[in-house]
A protein has these predicted regions:
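N-terminal secretory signal peptides
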Residues: 1-4
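N-terminal export signals
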Residues: 7-28
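Extracellular, repeat-based ectodomains that mediate carbohydrate processing or recognition
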Residues: 33-448
Length: 448
């Protein structure tokens, strides 16, 4: 379906706005959804339509919730946004923001104190593209596109108390170790490179999976990461490390959880280390997005460990003095799901009322099958009880053994967006494809 026809169908109530007719589990009819229903946002999603959980893709401001993802129609990769009016339950048409280079070009979305939306997207080892909405709390039109940086991939985006934007992305190089760069943008000014804050210890491919979250003071930036480094022809990621650091001055300087100063760009030798793995240790690690308790200011990290053929998810909570309390979520799976692998991607999110929520994947691949995009994948949501002892875990996706329902992205705080008592999750339904440039027709779902 071409872009113009897709916009027409969305506007007239056919196509993606009539999604409930395609999936009996969704109560969405002609673009209307109840808050807890599933809703088909698109049927042209790419292989990573909601991928890279560190990039926030859902923001609520007032009665509007805005959702961004990456499609792959016949004319190439495209970033789209739709808006849910929470008062009426009605969805807007899909509005195109811009292009993506390939399936890595998905967006990161935030909102400032005045309600203007900000979005970064496009690259896979290129400059990022950026736009601001023309009007507050309105995704239907965007200001002229601008670009910044070079050889960047994987965005994170948050908004500071004075509406300065803070952004990180991976920076690749030919002849030296890859890094994570921090950028900022003051209102009305161009993007400015602050500098590298993380660096691999090895030349060549690296991935950092970093996520950002504000402390309650809206000044302290907390960062969780998963270093993936030292790859060669024989092994993809010989060393993996889940780590943490924070900045108490808007990213100017960084320290460990105990306050010990870190010289940046930091390697895993300088930051808090929570878990170690990689091919050489026969342990696979993935990090989800972190969240910070709005009452205590303590960071909550989440990551998965794949070891001896089993996957489990760990939450780690800082005591602010260098210590971490870890808890395994896997034993709290419902009885009929135990025996499956609980894994990231996913993440954590505190609602404005202070309750902790999360998203994860569950899977059980058959022997010899690849776990990446495996049809056994389902997306889960979980919420911690008010006593802080138990988790209620349920499906975010409607179980479907024929389709991978994966890459969940949970709504979370980025500065000025409100987090409802039940944060939304979006996920991709369909396979990854064989190449980064494959144009697929995956479904993209909202789970409210």
């Amino acid at each position: 379906m071409n872009t113009k026809r897709r916009q027409f169908l969305a506007t007239t109530g056919g196509g993606i706005l009539g999604a409930g007719l395609l999936d009996s589990w969704s109560a969405s009819v002609l673009g209307k959804t109840n808050e807890r229903d599933g809703f088909l946002l698109s049927d042209e999603g790419c292989g990573r339509a909601t991928g890279y959980a560190e990039a926030n893709k859902i923001v609520t401001f007032g009665e509007q919730t805005h959702v961004a993802w990456l499609d792959s129609p016949a004319d190439g990769f495209r970033v789209w946004v739709r808006t849910l009016n929470r008062a009426t339950g009605l969805w807007s048409p899909a509005y195109m923001v811009g292009e993506g280079y390939d399936n890595h070009g998905g967006p990161a979305l935030t909102v400032d104190s005045e309600g203007y939306l900000h979005i970064a997207y496009f690259p896979h080892h290129h400059a990022f593209r950026y736009r601001r909405s023309k009007r507050p709390n309105d995704a239907s039109e965007w200001e002229e596109e601008s670009s910044f940086g070079e050889k960047l991939t994987y965005p994170t985006l948050v908004c500071g108390p004075d509406n300065t934007l803070y952004f990180t992305a991976r920076r690749s190089f030919k002849e030296k170790p890859w890094e994570v760069e921090l950028w900022s943008k003051r209102p009305g000014q161009d993007w400015s490179r602050v500098g590298p804050i993380l660096r691999s210890r090895y030349k060549g491919y690296a991935h950092f999976q970093e996520s950002l979250a504000w402390g309650p003071d809206h000044k302290t930036l907390h960062l969780c990461c998963r270093f993936h480094e030292n790859s060669d022809k024989e092994a993809y990621g010989r060393l993996q490390t889940v780590g943490y650091m924070k900045s108490e001055d808007f990213g100017k300087t960084w320290c460990r959880s105990d306050g010990g100063r870190i010289e940046t760009p930091a390697s895993v030798d300088e930051i808090d280390v929570l878990a170690q793995g990689g091919v050489d240790r026969e342990i696979g690690l993935r990090a989800g997005c972190l969240a910070v308790d709005p009452k205590t200011g303590m960071p909550h990290l989440i990551y998965s460990i794949k070891e001896n053929g089993r996957g489990r998810v760990i939450m780690a909570v800082s005591d602010g003095k260098g210590g971490w309390t870890r808890s395994d979520l896997s034993p709290q799976l419902p009885a009929d799901l135990r025996g499956r692998d609980l894994i990231m991607p996913g993440g954590l999110s505190f609602s404005d009322s202070g309750q902790l929520h999360g998203a994860a994947q569950i899977q059980k691949a058959k022997e010899g099958e690849s776990t990446w995009g495996n049809p056994s994948n389902e997306s889960l949501r979980f919420v911690r009880d008010k006593d802080g002892d138990m988790w209620k875990i349920s499906f975010a996706s409607e179980p479907n053994s024929d389709r991978s329902q994966w890459l969940p992205n949970i709504e979370r705080a980025t500065g000025f967006n409100q987090i409802p008592d039940r944060p939304a999750i979006i996920y991709t339904s369909g396979g990854p494809g064989e190449k980064n440039t494959d144009l697929l027709s995956n479904r993209v779902y909202w789970a409210g």
